[in-house]
Amino acid sequence: MNTDRKFVHDMKNMLGIVIGYSNLLLDDMPANDPRRPDVDEIRKAGEAAVALLEAWNAPPKGI
């Protein structure tokens, strides 16, 4: 596995933990919990980071 792919793989694994634990917290929080928006932002940031990594690691178009 080349260095870029290994980096993306390792980062996605770590982000998966952040997203997974965020989802667990959200599942256990009441809808009116004042911390809920903050945890949701953490989850969304993790998902955005995964999407960014996937776009960065995608093969170039048109080649």
Roles of regions detected by a PLM:
Residues 1-6, 55:
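PAS-family sensory modules
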Residues 5-13:
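Conserved phosphoacceptor histidine of two-component systems
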Residues 1, 19, 58:
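Extended interaction regions within the primary functional domain
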Residues 26-33:
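Short acidic helix/loop segment immediately C-terminal to the autophosphorylated histidine
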Residues 36-63:
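Conserved DHp (HisKA) dimerization/phosphotransfer helix of two-component histidine kinases, i.e.
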Residues 25-26, 57:
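A conserved position within tetratricopeptide repeats
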